Structures are given as structure tokens and as C-alpha cells.
């Protein structure tokens, strides 16, 4: 940061920045993550605070529209200086010097560009640094993670309702008033979603009809458990915080996606160039740490619910391990539970790794 570069070398510097930083390691990121990263970088440039040539914007759009995705190694970024290495691999493809994923195959970038009538980018002053400096990769991956987490949450809510229907639980655990007493918006919303899903269900029991009608009989025990197991009854309290975590992550990631995450930042209106740290990735990384914990909570809930479903002495409804064949001869889903435990255990042990 102390060396003065002569005007004659400024364009060469842009190429050197990209080539020297294209040294990531590991497997390539999925195409969807690379696409999200490229879109995030394009959005940054559209803020017109990076000082790049319009050709940079055009070629990023051309790559996206033609579904050309640079091969980007997954290891190398630490976030403190943005996604330098991963973004350099994207930039290397834009100048036609890398491999890309194109139409289901890995081909040289120049070959894919020629097939689509795209001319390799000629770098000008500022272009190389702007292409490599920012949080586009972590933001793009974060948005993909967010979409998947929202999908998982939707499945978790539906599966929880179905499980309660299978064992004919009482429905008051999802009552509007009960969950509003807790005040948390996420819990209230999950309970509302559950009520909407089972609005026409005939499988759930009404507590007032069975316990408060005065017709409970003289037996020492009730026919059905007064309070179902936690994995059935505490769904709003478990998935409510998950929903709020996802919503907060979405807020931060959308802000980051639309932000100017470059450095330096060029402000033509003020006639000023700011040197700062907008490339720093803590906003995204902290939200991803929290999102991983939330996803772990969903896996733990699913494992406990399946454990309940598989054990006839607990659910008092289904055969052991949902074995619909001949006991002893058939095994049902017994082995599946072992697989579930194995899959969920690492996430419980290291939920933010």
C-alpha cells in the first residue's frame, strides 16, 4: 500500500491483481453459488460507486444471461479482506483466462465466450481491484443458504403438523392466544402457520371436548396423554426462534447485497474517493453462524420427531419402526434411525463449523 505505480503500469496492475490472487484451493463452488456471487458483484457496480468501466457491467450481465459460471475454488477467503481469491477466479474468467462451467461441461472460458459471441474483458484502471474486492461471494452463498433454510423451515412446520395429526394430539398448543402470551413474533407466526395448515383437519383433538366436558369416566388414567411430548407440543417455541433468525439473516443479507462493498469508494457527486473497509465481511459471517445454529435446531427437532414416530411404546399408534410387514421378518425403518443419528450428530457437536 506504500508503492507508487506509474501511469504507464496502471492497466498492467489490474491484470496482475487478478492473476496473482487466482490461487484458491479445493473443490469448485456449485454453479448456483457462483451465479449468486456474480449477481451480487454486478449489483455493487450498479451503485456507480466503484469507478469501473461500463464494459465490466456488460460482461458480468453477459455471463449471467448465457449461464457461464467460472470455476471458483471454495477455499481461500477469510472475509476480513473480502473474498479476494474467489472473486479473482471470477475475474480471471472474464478476461478469458480460466475454466468455466458451461452447458453442463467444464471448458476454457475463451471457448464458452466465443460460443456466445462475448469478447474477453479489456481491463482499465480500477477494474481489476474492483472485481476482486468485496463480499460478493460470501453474500451470494449466504443468500443461497438462506433460501434453503426457508425451504427447510416450511417442511419442518408441515411435517410437525402431520406428526401431530398421526397421533391425534390436542390442538391447543398452537392456539393464537396461548402463543401471543409469549410475545415473540416468530412463535406467533409459526403457530399461525400450523393452524392454517390443519384448519380442515379431523385428526386433531379438542381438549375442551375430551377433558372439560365432565365425561372423563372413572378410569385412573386418561385415554390420551394430557400433554404430548415436547417434540410435538413445543413446535412454535422451537421453530419460532428459527424463523426470527432466518428473517434477521435475510435483512442483513439483502442490505449487504444492495450495499457498496468496494474499496476505495468513488463518489462522483461529491468529487471524493473514500478509503475504508466496506469489504469487511463480519455482517454476513455472523448471520451465517447464527443461521447454522438455527438449521441445527431443525435437524435436532426432526431427529426427535422421527424417534417418536419409530417407537410404538412412545407414540402408541404405529407399529415398531413403522414396520408394516411381519415383525421379525421385516425391519421397517429401524436402520434409517441409525443413519439419522449419524447425520445429525456432527451438527450438534459443532453447530457453527
Describe each model-derived feature in a short phrase.
Residues 341-345, 349-353:
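Single conserved hydrophobic/aromatic residue that forms the stacking wall/gate
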Residues 2-35:
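Residues that scaffold, gate, or flank divalent-cation-dependent active/transport sites
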Residues 88-90, 296-340:
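Small-residue-enriched alpha-helical segments and adjacent helix-cap loops
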Residues 22-184:
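Active-site cavity-forming subdomains of large catalytic enzyme subunits
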Residues 164-300:
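Accessory "access/gating" subregions that flank catalytic or transport cores
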Residues 8-12, 32, 51-58, 82-85, ...:
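Conserved active-site and cofactor/substrate-binding residues in soluble primary-metabolism enzymes
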Amino acid at each position: 500500500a506504500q508503492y507508487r505505480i506509474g501511469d504507464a503500469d496502471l492497466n498492467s496492475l489490474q491484470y496482475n491483481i487478478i492473476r496473482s490472487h487466482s490461487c484458491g484451493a479445493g473443490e469448485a463452488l456449485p454453479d448456483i453459488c457462483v451465479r449468486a456471487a456474480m449477481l451480487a458483484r454486478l449489483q455493487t457496480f450498479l451503485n456507480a460507486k466503484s469507478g469501473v468501466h461500463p464494459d465490466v457491467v456488460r460482461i458480468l450481465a453477459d455471463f449471467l444471461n448465457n449461464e457461464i459460471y467460472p470455476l471458483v475454488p471454495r477455499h481461500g477467503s477469510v472475509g476480513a479482506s473480502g473474498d479476494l481469491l474467489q472473486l479473482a477466479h471470477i475475474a480471471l474468467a472474464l478476461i478469458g483466462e480460466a475454466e468455466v462451467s458451461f452447458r453442463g461441461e467444464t471448458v476454457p472460458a475463451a471457448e464458452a465466450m466465443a460460443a456466445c459471441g462475448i469478447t474477453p474483458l479489456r481491463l482499465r484502471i480500477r477494474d481489476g481491484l474492483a472485481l476482486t474486492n468485496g463480499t460478493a461471494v460470501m453474500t451470494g452463498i449466504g443468500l443461497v443458504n438462506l433460501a434453503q433454510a426457508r425451504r427447510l423451515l416450511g417442511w419442518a412446520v408441515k411435517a410437525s403438523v402431520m406428526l401431530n395429526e398421526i397421533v391425534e394430539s390436542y390442538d391447543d398448543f398452537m392456539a393464537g392466544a396461548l402463543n401471543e402470551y409469549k410475545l415473540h413474533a416468530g412463535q406467533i407466526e409459526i403457530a399461525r402457520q400450523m393452524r392454517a395448515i390443519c384448519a380442515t383437519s379431523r385428526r386433531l383433538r379438542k381438549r375442551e371436548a375430551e377433558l372439560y366436558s365432565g365425561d372423563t369416566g372413572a378410569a385412573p388414567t386418561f385415554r390420551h396423554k394430557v400433554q404430548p411430548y415436547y417434540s410435538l407440543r413445543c413446535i412454535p417455541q422451537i421453530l419460532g426462534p428459527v424463523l426470527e433468525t432466518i428473517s434477521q439473516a435475510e435483512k442483513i443479507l439483502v442490505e449487504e447485497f444492495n450495499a457498496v462493498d468496494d474499496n476505495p469508494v468513488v463518489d462522483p457527486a461529491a468529487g471524493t474517493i473514500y478509503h475504508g473497509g466496506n469489504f469487511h465481511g463480519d455482517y454476513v459471517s455472523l448471520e451465517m453462524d447464527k443461521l447454522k445454529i438455527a438449521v441445527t435446531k431443525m435437524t435436532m427437532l426432526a431427529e426427535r420427531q422421527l424417534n417418536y414416530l419409530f417407537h410404538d411404546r412412545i407414540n402408541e399408534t404405529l407399529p415398531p419402526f413403522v414396520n408394516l410387514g411381519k415383525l421379525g421378518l421385516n425391519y421397517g425403518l429401524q436402520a434409517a434411525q441409525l443413519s439419522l443419528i449419524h447425520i445429525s450428530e456432527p451438527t450438534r457437536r459443532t453447530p457453527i463449523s
